[in-house]
A protein has these predicted regions:
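N-terminal domain-onset segments
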Residues: 1-67, 76, 80-82, 199, ...
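Generic structural hydrophobic/aromatic packing signal, biased to beta-strands
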Residues: 24-26, 52-54, 70-72, 87, ...
Length: 221
């Protein structure tokens, strides 16, 4: 790919994105974290809560795309910032821009969706391996408004390291969310931690949101 074509595929921040998402909350034990060291989860002697996000971006500067990521939250006593240690997306343009502008280690995967009433199935394929996620919404669930200003700033202060650079940025978002009934995983194999072995906490469906990704502060390692 020549330099001119590469330049056309880059869209400088800030980015403004719209979509819907599932936010899955899990409590991880120290043993779970140790057994999944390959996914770059920060160690913890007592365990902690992390989030998994499955997102469908309907509008973005690079067009619609799907995303599955781990959002690993800080250990307050050690002043670790939040990070995204593992992430898959469905388009090459999202991979290129995420790596370049935010240091996010995006990898290209295929997403297939099946939606039947209040049940959502998502199959994710990467390097000839396929995993599936089954999500069940409540038929009738109260919707709440959420804004990033309601969340402690440290939780949204994301720090990434990529190709010799440190990136730091704080996304801003607003939207609506409702409680999710259930989430189950199958065949995570080597491409994602098996969160069926972690403690599932109250999770949420976000039927609509608006997200802003600002420019990241960048420093050399």
């Amino acid at each position: 790919m020549n330099e001119e074509l590469i330049a056309k595929n880059f869209h400088h921040p800030p980015w403004h994105l719209h979509g819907d998402a599932f936010i899955l909350n899990y409590w991880l034990t120290p043993n779970f974290i140790k057994s999944n060291q390959a996914f770059q989860l920060a160690p913890s002697p007592i365990g902690r809560v992390i989030q998994i996000m499955l997102v469908r971006y309907h509008k973005s500067p690079v067009g619609p795309y799907d995303e599955l990521l781990i959002l690993d939250h800080p250990l307050m006593s050690k002043r670790h910032l939040s990070s995204i240690p593992k992430i898959y997306v469905s388009t090459p343009a999202s991979v290129m821009n995420g790596q370049r502008f935010w240091g996010i280690p995006k990898q290209l995967a295929q997403f297939e969706w099946v939606i039947k009433d209040d049940v959502v199935y998502c199959n994710i394929s990467f390097q000839q391996q396929e995993m599936s996620l089954h999500l069940q919404k409540y038929k009738h669930s109260q919707t709440f408004y959420i804004n990033s200003h309601h969340i402690p700033a440290q939780l949204l202060n994301i720090h990434q390291t990529w190709q010799g650079l440190h990136y730091q940025f704080s996304p801003q978002f607003r939207g609506k969310l409702c409680k999710l009934k259930q989430a189950s995983w199958k065949n995570t194999l080597d491409i994602f931690p098996d969160f069926s072995q972690a403690k599932y906490l109250q999770s949420f469906y976000v039927p609509e949101f608006k997200l802003t990704l600002p420019s990241a502060k960048m420093n050399k390692k």
